[in-house]
């Protein structure tokens, strides 16, 4: 008799995705982050659901409701800090996942890659709106500054900003709609994840060598399930250590002050995972130019497949491209540091140089070096 997991209409979908899925035998730990992101999403949805049971999206009570969750709700502080630091873990895994895709040339699977970029935008939008909900100083001013950027759009900008605000400033209407969208978006993200996996399983996984692995496949279970469980344990250890020992390490102290429209904080900055994009935004003196650079800093990923000039898919056998890749990583870390610094000399000039380098590496140097490598290999 055939196993039920292979015949049942629902179970056979799970079976072909998680149990009997043929996977390349050479996948390294860099391929763990997809499953870790799935776990992060589940953790965020669950903790968020319980937080939403106690949160009130009203400007008069939002800040106090978060305090109430931490002080009066059973293990409310664990829920709150798991959710806040879970977002940081989510972004760490996201950036490593994208980095892996860039390094090993996974972007050649364009449908999967483009859905991934869409997912990245959706997660960033969700995180931004979530940061507004505690209604602290940084929440309020962050929302004001970032939504105000849309006013740079010619002709419709001002109307668009007021439409998003639901008035003439960030107020009760803004907070309520941000809460509604913050609750809704993770479920849209979950649906997009299914589409992401659907396209991935059409082509099969890439592997570190970048060479087709159809001749050498192994079943996903037990080999990669046990590998994913190890990755999960490491991530959960890191997350629980962060939550239990220094929950505010990655947060901003200003957010423990209730929002006050009459008092601007000395340095308005987003959460750490947006600092690189914020630095690129600030490095251009023109408002519209800054907004365009901000959007392009992520959207540039969409044209990476078109800029692939190498005859090899992966970077594993391309030392010159590897040097450029790690230069890009160092550049992004520099931008992240600059994003958290005040707008003054020498930070401004460093930020501008790092921003130019970021776009130059992706648009000019990567394709150029790939062509040079082809030439050196006489291809």
UniProtKB/Swiss-Prot annotation:
Subcellular location: Mitochondrion inner membrane
Cellular component terms (Gene Ontology): mitochondrial inner membrane; respiratory chain complex III
Pfam families: Cytochrom_B_C, Cytochrome_B
Binding site for heme b b566: 97, 196
Annotated GO biological process: mitochondrial electron transport, ubiquinol to cytochrome c
Transmembrane segments: 33-53, 77-98, 113-133, 178-198, 226-246, 288-308, 320-340, 347-367
Keywords tagged on the record: Electron transport, Heme, Iron, Membrane, Metal-binding, Mitochondrion, Mitochondrion inner membrane, Respiratory chain, Transmembrane, Transmembrane helix, Transport, Ubiquinone
Cofactor(s) the record lists: heme b
Keyword Transport: yes
Subunit structure: The cytochrome bc1 complex contains 11 subunits: 3 respiratory subunits (MT-CYB, CYC1 and UQCRFS1), 2 core proteins (UQCRC1 and UQCRC2) and 6 low-molecular weight proteins (UQCRH/QCR6, UQCRB/QCR7, UQCRQ/QCR8, UQCR10/QCR9, UQCR11/QCR10 and a cleavage product of UQCRFS1). This cytochrome bc1 complex then forms a dimer.
Family classification: Belongs to the cytochrome b family.
Name assigned to this protein: Cytochrome b
The organism of origin for this protein: Micronycteris hirsuta
Lineage: Eukaryota, Metazoa, Chordata, Craniata, Vertebrata
Gene: MT-CYB
